[in-house]
Every structure is written in structure tokens, then in C-alpha cells.
Amino acid sequence: MTFVEPIITHAPNEKVMAKQWLHGYQYGPLWVPPLIGPGTLANLFLAYTAQSQMQRIAYIVAALSIFSILPITFFYMEPGINGATKWKVQMLLKDEGFGMKDTTVWYPSAHRQGGTLASRRWAERTGMKELILFWRRVNNWRWGIAFLAAVASGWATFSEVA
């Protein structure tokens, strides 16, 4: 479902795996927020203009679902698996001069390090492949949330078509 499979299947070593994962991971902020913002606002507008209570509820569920991806990312994934995986990338590529500045929850960035000390320690004792596979598993939950939002919004849109 993500760019992960070719990386874990074909990367010849952990360094290459780390570079490929980071490159793919850093594309996320280019397209995820531009989908979440308008998707949330559009569903809120549709809820406001909905003709039935059921439509309104479905649009609100869709808006809240799609918006929930941001706090999940910033408050759960960034200090956890995102931070751990970026820390592992730093560890593997430090001999090439690669490093990331630290970030805070108020300034999230795919180009900065936001992992907690616990997630960094976890990364130090875990292989790159295992981290990437866990990242994919957590990331797939966000895809599931987006699917739920699409189903709720789609149902609300087509429920009154007759």
C-alpha cells in the first residue's frame, strides 16, 4: 500500500534502505496536508449545508476523521515511530555527514528529528527493516482513517440522490 515494499525487498543493505525510506517519507508533507485541509473544510461545509440529519452526521464524521490524521501524526507518530526511524537513519548515515536538527511538537518536520529518548533507544537496538515495517503498519492506520472518511462523505453525498 506504500512505497515500503520495494525498499525492504530490494535494498542491498541498511544504509540504502535508510536513504530510500527517508526520501519517500519526506514526500509525505508535500501532499498529505494539502489533502487534509481542504478535505476537512469541504466536509464541514457540506455538513453545514446538508439537508438531512444523517447526511450532516456523516459529513461531520468524515471531517473529524480526516482531520484526526494530523494529531495522530504529530503527537503519536512523530515522537514514536517517525522519530525512531529518523534516528536510525541518522545513526546509519552519520559517517556520511548526515544529521538532523531536533524539532518540537510545535514545529513538526520530516526534515528534523522529533523522537523521544525512548524511541531513540528503541531505534538503536532495532534493525532498519523492522522499523520500516512497523512504520508501515502504523501508517496504514492513517490510510484506514482516510478510507473511513471517504466512505462517510461518499455515503452522505449519494444518500439523497434519487
Can you annotate each of these PLM segments?
Residues 32-39, 58, 62-65, 142-145, ...:
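Hydrophobic alpha-helical transmembrane segments of polytopic
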Residues 104-113:
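Intrinsically disordered, low-complexity cytosolic loops and termini enriched
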Residues 1-2, 64-82:
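Hydrophobic alpha-helical membrane-embedded segments
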Residues 123-148:
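Individual transmembrane alpha-helices with interfacial aromatic-anchor signatures
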Residues 1-42, 85-104, 121-124, 131:
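Interfacial loop at the N-terminal end of multi-pass membrane proteins
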Residues 154-162:
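Juxtamembrane boundary at the C-terminal end of a transmembrane helix
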Residues 49-69:
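Interfacial segments of alpha-helical transmembrane regions
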